[in-house]
Amino acid sequence: MNLTALKNMPVSELITLGEKMGLENLARMRKQDIIFAILKQHAKSGEDIFGDGVLEILQDGFGFLRSADSSYLAGPDDIYVSPSQIRRFNLRTGDTISGKIRPPKEGERYFALLKVNAVNYDKPENARSKILFENLTPLHANSRLRMERGNGSTEDLTARVLDLASPIGRGQRGLIVAPPKAGKTILLQNIAQSIAYNHPDCVLMVLLIDERPEEVTEMQRLVKGEVVASTFDEPASRHVQVAEMVIEKAKRLVEHKKDVIILLDSITRLARAYNTVVPASGKVLTGGVDANALHRPKRFFGAARNVEEGGSLTIIATALVDTGSKMDEVIYEEFKGTGNMELPLSRKIAEKRVFPAIDYNRSGTRKEELLTLPDELQKMWILRKIIHPMSEIDAMEFLLNKLSMTKTNDEFFDMMKRS
């Protein structure tokens, strides 16, 4: 029996399963307590129970396997991992672990891990010899992540504009600069769907910090990947804990030579949360930002890199501007030069209801020649020369009009050549 499978079952099915096992009064219990009772009953019959989760090591040396379903929030169905197991397999916070578990004994509150079967979807022996993330060699992104799906849909137009304006590679550190109501969430959804469709080999994680609950639900339903969220009604310490767990998990997967992509909405809200949580240093910057507050969000954003030894970590984050808050301006200015891809959205274009509201002339990727073929790069530069004299609204309308006549960007360039 698998603990994760039980968590994914609806309560009605769990109650039916429990009643078959001879358990009573389940209808009045919470879901976690029902699972608890079923597993205890199952263990009495001497059968094996399996569980998995992402390890969080606490200050006392022991750890717990947290569940992604509850956005890594501590819960009664977390699995205890002893310090001896952590030392034996050289485990660190963020490791994804699956193995055999046992129910709590008398006086215990949590399930405990008996045997480790896999670490980061790999054999436990392989986990000991991996190179730490900090010791890996960072390089410029040189392997392209294509966004275009080629199905001619209106959603694909966004992906195609993105491919032309600022190509994304594995290991990119991208910043989407967005004023309010410019369509940043929809843009992120489009990017997530394109990645899931074109690059199923990549591990996709969407991290929503300080977002509205209905947007979280929408994202979970639309995106084929892990959606981790901390909504605006949660405390700042919770935002920080969720972000730390996600970045640690991503780093551990990169150590195993996996390509990981994190879409973060938004880095401004994350920096605000760190500003609330960090102990006061006494030095305060403009807008009420503590001098030490931006170190940790910069470490989060700076983790994005293409790795020479294999694997990559791509982070595409949104930064809020024109919100009327001085703090948001300061945070944006601090992050402005750190990315190697920038995609500014325009409020003017969005107000005219032209989407995607991308400011084509100001967007771009550093070292884009490493991501595109020389022939394609030449065509992209010619397109920029044509669009440059136009205003931002005219440029976007012109581009969308021409793109909608064709299914793919290659066809679009051929059409451009003929005309």
Curated annotation (Swiss-Prot):
GO molecular function, one term: RNA binding
Biological processes annotated in GO: DNA-templated transcription termination
Sequence positions that bind ATP: G169, R170, G171, Q172, R173, G174, K181, A182, G183, K184, T185, I186, R212
Site (described: RNA-binding 2): K326
One Pfam family here: Rho_RNA_bind
Enzyme Commission no: 3.6.4.-
Entry annotated with the keyword Lipid biosynthesis: no
Gene Ontology CC annotations of this record: cytosol
Domain of life where this protein originates: Bacteria
Keywords: ATP-binding, Helicase, Hydrolase, Nucleotide-binding, RNA-binding, Transcription, Transcription regulation, Transcription termination
Similarity section: Belongs to the Rho family.
Subunit-level organization: Homohexamer. The homohexamer assembles into an open ring structure.
Protein name (database record): Transcription termination factor Rho
Organism this protein belongs to: Buchnera aphidicola subsp. Schizaphis graminum (strain Sg)
